[in-house]
């Protein structure tokens, strides 16, 4: 019995006892909260339900708690239910009910942890969306790791997720990129507002190799030749870097398509027709202050050209017109102002503003030997995704970026994350997984049927450390659901670290396999089943954050 099952049992029991005493059962919460008590001696789980609803129902807290304890004591899954303090209820599970969690994990396999929180929901998840003017920097790398992991968490919670990359190929930054390429191809200095770094020279050379006559023609023709070919080459490199990082997108959405298809013009006309725009100072303004923005936004500038927000307006409309129920934008620390304007744009167009979510990620800093690492050899300016992977590997890079909340800035110690020690969190978890795989291989050599461990006598698992490990396994589905609801995939990584620690404590005190010359006992099969279930959940957790689960290390 996992916490979710226990929550349902307690709620059903509470409804029955309240009805039996002719009291109002409608005061019960939708979900009863059950927690692990700080002191394990108090039981396996605890709930404050009686304190929460007794007075509303017309009873005293301890009185209701006693009714619950008496009723629960008659359930085969409950070994003991006792009252503490003003009405807390402590619960100890029967050994068979506790062991059933192990069988549940083994039978569910890779699906253990999945839930239906977002069943039937279509979610558009936009992340990275770096300009195609240079390699992905550390901020974009953080979003690549966190965004892909969040997509996995949402999918594990039943959602249909579209991973989307917004390709910014419309605007002045592309012109500056093209001018930088032309200058590099001619051997001239980088323009004052241009892009520098070795990658510019590489792409410029690539354009010339592809089109030896790229520098021939008028200035406009040369600019366009380097613009189109250069952007294509740069974006191909970005895609390759992301793919090697384990991140692929379902949709690469081109900003230019919004203008070329008439979507921008259509959205603006809709806003005009509905009275959501007004003309002032020769420009057209969105009445965004009516929807919580701090100021109205220019949509059409006085020169007749569309402002940047015009593309945003058409893009949010496109996302919902494609049938998405929720649009999540993952943006950098300098995009706080986008939250209100995106929600305002959606509401002005007639969509639910609460269906627009903006997650803001903070900066990432690299440290080596206590000193900041600031320069990329290739980019010439900032550290890139490829630099980080080269330093600590894909698994180290992804895990280091996903294990912390994006609300705070992050320092990555390259020496720590490259080390093969228990101080390295990803190594610690992966080592735990590999260690269990080694145990299972040894068990097979000893004649254990490792494919039938769900049938082991799991009610023999009564040691304190066995109980700690089983209860930790049982928490995984709730951790996944919470990570999805709060958009916090770092909870999965932290859980994996806790699970590894709890397993190591179990393994230190509970002999899993018989020693040489010892007879095989039923407890060995039960503990082997527990170890196998732990391996499965470790694998599921690592997979959910996009990190490998090696069988050997």
Curated annotation (Swiss-Prot):
Subcellular compartments: Cytoplasm
Keywords from the UniProt entry: Aminoacyl-tRNA synthetase, ATP-binding, Cytoplasm, Ligase, Nucleotide-binding, Protein biosynthesis
The record's annotation in Gene3D superfamilies points to: Arginyl tRNA synthetase N-terminal domain, HUPs, Isoleucyl-tRNA Synthetase, Domain 1
Main location, first listed in the record: cytoplasm
A GO molecular-function annotation: ATP binding
Gene Ontology BP terms: arginyl-tRNA aminoacylation
The UniProt record lists the EC number as 6.1.1.19
* Motif 'HIGH' region location, chain numbering: 130-140
Reaction catalysed? tRNA(Arg) + L-arginine + ATP = L-arginyl-tRNA(Arg) + AMP + diphosphate
Q: Which InterPro entries match?
A: aa-tRNA-synth_I_CS, Arg-tRNA-ligase, Arg-tRNA-synth_N, Arg-tRNA-synth_N_sf, ArgRS_core, DALR_anticod-bd, Rossmann-like_a/b/a_fold, tRNAsynth_Ia_anticodon-bd
Query: Main EC class of this protein?
Result: ligase
Q: Give a GO cellular-component term.
A: cytoplasm
Q: Which NCBIfam families match?
A: argS
**What's the family?**
Belongs to the class-I aminoacyl-tRNA synthetase family.
Assembly and partners are described as: Monomer.
Task: Name it.
Answer: Arginine--tRNA ligase
**What species is given as this protein's source?**
Corynebacterium aurimucosum (strain ATCC 700975 / DSM 44827 / CIP 107346 / CN-1) (Corynebacterium nigricans)
């Amino acid at each position: 019995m996992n916490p979710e099952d226990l929550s349902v049992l307690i709620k059903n029991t509470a409804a029955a006892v309240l009805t039996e005493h002719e009291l109002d059962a409608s005061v019960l919460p939708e979900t009863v909260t059950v927690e692990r008590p700080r002191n394990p001696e108090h039981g396996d789980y605890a709930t404050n339900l009686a304190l929460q609803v007794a007075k509303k129902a017309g009873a005293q807290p301890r009185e209701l708690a006693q009714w619950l304890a008496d009723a629960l004591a008659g359930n085969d899954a409950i070994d003991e239910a006792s009252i503490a303090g003003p009405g807390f209820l402590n619960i100890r599970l029967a050994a068979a009910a506790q062991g059933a969690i192990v069988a549940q994990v083994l039978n569910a396999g890779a699906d253990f942890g999945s839930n239906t929180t977002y069943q039937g929901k279509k979610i558009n998840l936009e992340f990275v969306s770096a300009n195609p003017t240079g390699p992905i920097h550390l901020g974009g790398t953080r979003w690549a790791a966190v965004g892909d992991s969040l997509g996995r968490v949402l999918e594990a919670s039943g959602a249909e997720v579209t991973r989307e990359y917004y390709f910014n190929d419309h605007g002045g930054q592309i012109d500056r990129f093209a001018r930088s390429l032309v200058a590099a191809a001619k051997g001239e200095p980088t323009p004052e507002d241009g892009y520098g770094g070795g990658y510019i020279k590489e792409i410029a050379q690539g354009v010339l190799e592809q089109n030896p006559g790229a520098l021939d023609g008028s200035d406009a023709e040369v600019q366009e030749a380097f613009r189109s070919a250069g952007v294509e080459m740069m974006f191909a490199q970005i895609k390759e870097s992301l793919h090697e990082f384990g991140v692929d997108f379902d949709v690469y959405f081109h900003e230019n398509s919004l203008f070329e298809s008439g979507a921008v013009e259509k959205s603006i006309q809709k806003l005009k027709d509905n009275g959501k725009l007004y003309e002032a100072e020769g420009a057209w303004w969105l009445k965004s202050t009516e929807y919580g923005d701090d100021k109205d936004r220019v949509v059409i500038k006085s020169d007749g050209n569309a402002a940047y927000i015009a593309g945003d307006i058409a893009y949010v409309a496109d996302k919902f017109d494609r049938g998405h129920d929720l649009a999540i934008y993952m943006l950098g620390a300098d995009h706080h102002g986008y939250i209100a304007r995106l929600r305002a744009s959606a509401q002005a167009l007639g969509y639910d503003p609460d269906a627009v979510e903006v997650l803001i990620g903070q900066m990432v800093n690299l440290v080596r030997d206590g000193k900041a690492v600031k320069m990329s050899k290739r980019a010439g300016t900032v550290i890139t995704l490829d630099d980080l992977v080269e330093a600590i590997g894909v698994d180290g890079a992804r895990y280091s970026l996903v294990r912390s909340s994006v609300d705070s800035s992050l320092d990555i110690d390259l020496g720590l994350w490259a080390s093969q020690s228990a101080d390295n969190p990803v190594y610690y978890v992966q080592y735990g997984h590999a260690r269990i795989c080694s145990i299972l291989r040894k068990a097979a050599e000893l004649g254990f049927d490792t494919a039938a461990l769900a049938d082991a006598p799991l009610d023999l698992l009564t040691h304190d450390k066995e109980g700690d490990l089983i209860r930790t396994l049982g928490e995984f589905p709730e951790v996944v659901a919470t990570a999805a609801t709060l958009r916090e995939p770092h909870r999965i990584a932290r859980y994996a670290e806790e699970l590894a620690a709890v397993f190591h404590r179990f393994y230190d005190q509970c002999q899993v396999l018989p020693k040489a010359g010892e007879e095989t006992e039923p407890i060995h099969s039960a503990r082997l089943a527990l170890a196998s279930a732990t391996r499965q959940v470790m694998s599921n957790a690592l997979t959910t954050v996009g990190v490998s689960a090696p069988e050997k290390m």
